[in-house]
Structures are given as structure tokens and as C-alpha cells.
Amino acid sequence: MKTFLTEQQIKVLVLRAKGLKQSEIAKILKTTRANVSILEKRALEKIEKAKNTLLLWEQINSKVNVNVKAGEDIFSVPEKLFKKADEAGVKVPYSTAEIIAFLVEHAPIENRLAKRDFVIFLDSKNRLRISDCLINLDEIEKK
């Protein structure tokens, strides 16, 4: 299987998942603890990038997405989402209360206000998702 991780990085992650310390892994792999630390750090960075890439792919293929600006009251978001969904002919399988509860749990908000810009979108499986990647799909489609 193709992966972004090297064989050594996979070994380190497997052994860490089993609860081994970096020094113990270093002995098993016949290397230094510092090298194990670097391998683990780079592996986790690659995993984070892969997760972000998949989230971006979901956003690109989203049925409906709404940009939320820093300082915006999240109570206005469900109405915007429903309006965009109506325009796209998509049924949102969530109530206003469910959308707000999702935002409270997953979005960068404080006291009902967005702390920074983000996107809420309905993915291809009708799941609500949050992304920090503010791509304007409407603008791209016009070009």
C-alpha cells in the first residue's frame, strides 16, 4: 500500500501505540532516542497534512458550504446554511438546534461569536464538517 510514511516511521508509530518509550524503541531499532523522536515528529506532521488534505477534498466535494467570519454570531449560521442548501436543491438533515450544537462543540467560537474565520459544510455523506480553509468555491466556478 502506498503511504506518506516511511517504514521506519511506521515502526516507531506502531511501537509508540503499544506504549513503548522512545528510548525503548531506539534500542529495538538500534538507533538513538533523538532519531526516534525525529521520526515520530515527522510522521505525525505527515499524518496531520494528510488529514487536512482529506478535509479539503471533502470541502471541495461538499454539497453546501458557508463561510463564517470572525466575530459573526453563530446563531445566524443555520439560516445561511439552509438558504444555500435551498439554492442548491439540497435537504439539510439537521435542525437549527442541531447545527448550533455542532458549532458549539466543533467550531472556534466563544460566547456565540466566531473567534476566527472558518467554513461549515455538508459533506458528500451529509455530515456537518468544519474547515479553516476558506476557499471560495463560488468564485472558482465563475471562472
Curated annotation (Swiss-Prot):
InterPro entries: RNA_pol_sigma70_r4, Tfx_C, Tfx_DNA-bd_arc, Tfx_DNA-bd_euryarc, Tfx_DNA-bd_sf_arc. The keyword Nucleotide-binding does not apply. Keywords: DNA-binding, Transcription, Transcription regulation. GO terms for molecular function: DNA binding; DNA-binding transcription factor activity. GO terms for biological process: DNA-templated transcription initiation. The keyword Cell membrane does not apply. Belongs to the Tfx family. Putative transcriptional regulator. This is Putative transcriptional regulatory protein PH0763. It comes from Pyrococcus horikoshii (strain ATCC 700860 / DSM 12428 / JCM 9974 / NBRC 100139 / OT-3).
